[in-house]
Amino acid sequence: MATWGAQHRRFENLMRYRIRDILLVSSPYDYFTLEEDGRLNELLLVDYQQLNLSYAPRITHAATGERALDLLKERPFDLVITMARVGEMAVHVFGRRAKEIQSGIPVVLLAYNTRELALFHEGDAIDRIFVWSGDARVLLAIIKLVEDLRNVDHDTRAGEAQVLILVEDSPRFYSLFLPQLYSELMKQTGSLMAGGLSLHHKLLRMRARAKILLATDMEQAQELYSRYAPFLLGVISDAGFPSEGSHDPQAGKKFVAQVQRESPDAALMMQSSLPENRKVAAKLGVEFIDKADQSLLKGLRSFMRANLGFGDFVFRLPDGEEVGRAQDIAGMRKLLPTCRASRCAT
């Protein structure tokens, strides 16, 4: 078992890429709407503090695409989030020019409604499309998704960080689901350490949390799985999504079945707004949640606690009898002497 000193050095080496400066591009009206519930910088800071994250990025606003391009020429940014209306410039033209000024900078489009979604698509100019629903936590999800994608290669190999793959092609749904998924992942990661470590050590260990990677079609899902199968913690997949250029209602079943065969220890869950897909999941023997269910978050939380290693530490005798249960590391340490004497196992 690695010593704390070795683990400390390993954790410090993770999450090398961090988003510190964000350029937000929107019309004054759109910016006013975004800040209707409070200043974005302050809301983001509160979200980071509540989740025990060590820093919050700074947001700089530009009212037009031209002004944003000038700012990109003046100083570096880590991420561009743009609304659809950026002055006289088309948003795809803006995204392309932004990447010409700062090579490799991620550009995320934040749309307002379904009509806007129909007008835009991901490509060379736009890396990802999200939908604003009034919940500022979508900004945290965007930030963490970009960071995870940039850090996953290094962190899986240097620190053995695990990977959770989300397969979902609806920007509207993943814009609602990802903030919940990230919040729950961070809360449950933190709960395992409650009372057992100093704040500094907790912040370090948060760097080693599972990376969330988003795929919006079968080709992306297969690529992510092929690359990170040795580090796979689990898969949450929609029942139907695009495959080979067209919608395949059986794509989720096919992908989950493949992962089930090749990575039998991975936690698997299907989600769908079609009730009949519950039977598909049951036949595969995997968890299922209804995307239209008001208790979706409760189902997600139960899945994570039961299947992703976030439940209690349970100590049992060789015959299966439970002799102890701990909710965090501190509780586990108290039980260890008794369990050693009883020769129990987790």
Describe these PLM feature segments:
Residues 24-26, 110-113, 168, 270-272:
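Short beta-strand/turn micro-motifs composed of small residues
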Residues 1-60, 87, 96, 119-128, ...:
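Non-catalytic signal-transmission and effector/linker regions of two-component phosphorelay proteins
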Residues 91, 119-129, 280-289:
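As written
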Residues 3-4, 33-41, 45, 54-56, ...:
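Conserved phosphotransfer microenvironments
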